[in-house]
Amino acid sequence: MARQYAVWGNPIAHSKSPYIHQLFAQQSNRRIEYAAKLGDKIAFEKQLVQFFTDGANGVNITSPFKARAFRLADVCSESCLLAGAANTLKRLDDGRLFADNTDGKGFCADLARLEWLIPEQRVLILGAGGVTKGVLLPLLLAKQKVTLSNRTHIKAVELAQQFAKYGDIQAVSLSEIVQHPPFDLIINATSLGLQGGYIALPNHLFEKSAVYDMEYASNMCTPFLNYVRTQGVTRYQDGLGMLVNQAAFSFQLWEGELPKVENVLKQLRAEMGYVK
């Protein structure tokens, strides 16, 4: 009998997770069923409990339900606890729900794939929301020197204080960032691109920087990456690799095997019409 999985979100029709997980399952001839489920913004918890009651083995969670899924779980990982959000739930043998947040592991795995995860490098993260919260622990454990900058500065300050015991992290306002020396890696973790926007930065910050946008789009044409190309940046990447890698860690949690991501990523790029 095929094991039952799903991704829950609202909206959800755009999700590539069912396709990704079926490709993972094919690597080891596993039988799974993986659906995209539209969560009700009021009755989400009831829906999720019923899904597990009906025999589901695990779920992925996307916006806007990650914090609510975390609160629903019985036990959770440290990364999940720090983020206050879950993107993966697993039904344990005793019926309890275990929550994890694989965003950070997936992000760092993609940086490692790109050979961009270099100890002691200076990293600027734009944004101080849930996505940033989910990736800070593995970044700091990988010895990255992190600077947070956010439109609402106090949110970046509070986040830096929360994670200070795990590594080198500071908050710098967007108005002060103009005085900062160049960064080795600049990460866009804002949601501005969904409305076609981005945070413009002084050109000198890009002088030797690689740029990673956690959003993804056909041909890597997110608003932020379109902008940084005009600033002369030649090393850039969108978040599709992060999506595939975080999915791989979810699959490992459920099925006990870490799938290979490179061919899956290539297939996704081809499906999206990526042209080198």
Curated annotation (Swiss-Prot):
Instruction: Spell out the subunit comment.
Output: Homodimer.
State which pathway it belongs to. Metabolic intermediate biosynthesis; chorismate biosynthesis; chorismate from D-erythrose 4-phosphate and phosphoenolpyruvate: step 4/7
Q: What is the protein's known function?
A: Involved in the biosynthesis of the chorismate, which leads to the biosynthesis of aromatic amino acids. Catalyzes the reversible NADPH linked reduction of 3-dehydroshikimate (DHSA) to yield shikimate (SA).
What is the name of this protein? Shikimate dehydrogenase (NADP(+))
Q: Which reaction does it catalyse?
A: shikimate + NADP(+) = 3-dehydroshikimate + NADPH + H(+)
| Active site annotation, chain numbering | K66 (proton acceptor)
The protein's UniProt keywords, in alphabetical order, are: Amino-acid biosynthesis, Aromatic amino acid biosynthesis, NADP, Oxidoreductase
Which amino acids does the record list as binding NADP(+)?
E78, G127, A128, G129, G130, V131, N150, R151, T152, H153, I154, K155, M214, G239
Any one GO cellular component localisation term in the record: cytosol
Q: At which positions is shikimate bound?
A: S15, K16, S17, T62, N87, D103, Y216
List, in alphabetical order, the Gene Ontology terms for molecular function in this entry: NADP binding; shikimate 3-dehydrogenase (NADP+) activity
Task: Provide one Gene Ontology biological process annotation.
Answer: amino acid biosynthetic process
| E.C. no | 1.1.1.25
| Annotated organism of origin | Haemophilus ducreyi (strain 35000HP / ATCC 700724)
Regarding protein family, the annotation reads: Belongs to the shikimate dehydrogenase family.
